[in-house]
Amino acid sequence: MNLPGLTGDRVLPPALRGPFNAESRRWLEALEVAGHDPIHNLRPCRVKPVACGRLAIVQESRRTGVGIPILGYLLQTPDELIVVDCGLSPRWRGGGQIHLGPDDSPSPGTPYMPELDGPSLAEQVAEMGLKPDRVICTHLHEDHSSGAVELGLPVEASGAEWARLDESDAESRGYPVDELAEVPRRTIELDPSAPLGPFLASARINTDVIAVDTAGHTPGSISLVASLGSAWVLICGDAVYPRMDDPDGPAWRGMLRISRALADLPALRVLPAHDTTVLRAVDGDAWMGAAAMPVDSDHD
């Protein structure tokens, strides 16, 4: 696959660059799963990470009343409908706030997520009458993977993420051990002999989608590069959000390397998982709550 602009050490900022065009709308829709009144909020990163550094995640007052979205994406290609990140399990509905980060060393910058308030991603997909073919998780933190049980499909993630899930402290690090014990595993095998532009390893998902190595936020984080007609997108999960418990370690350096690369690729639109600019840039208030744009009928 020839990806325009994916050469050398260049790429784009970790927030959506420009609005979706009509052709992109045919293929991609975002679902906001939750995001009401968290204790902490992520501030959308609208500048190059090399400039904003550790301010990619900041602590804000609860009094702001600004919710943080937890975004899952439905990626429709000619071959299949893929759920990319599946949000929170219904067990978080009315269950209080969750802490994503190590229980033994919470930091001021560690984000707190709200309880699930409203329909889960799977419930929204069912209401739209859609039947996904695959579920791919950029990483296995609970706000990206715990909703998988409802979808009734195997979960695909990198080998490094599955290995992290099996470690003794996985649950305290934000991995939904109990929920993921109920779903079949599929491993995406990243090939270091197949780098793609600034990404050190890749794996083909189908003719229109490639998984790339964006380890840093977690040891096995991946992102998906997708061809959407004339547009290219990178669904990056939390790859551009640093781990605050390891600010100077390899995780931070990996995140910073990817973010620097993403700062200069003008041909690529970057879709993070917790950035309100994605919602505003796509369709304003129409994207809030359970509202979602239907998949184009030509590609059902």
For each feature predicted by the language model, list its residue ranges.
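Cap/insert and terminal regions of metallo-dependent hydrolase folds
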Residues: R10-A15, P106-A122, G229-D300
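Metallo-beta-lactamase
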Residues: A30, A34-P38, M113-L130, G159-D213, ...
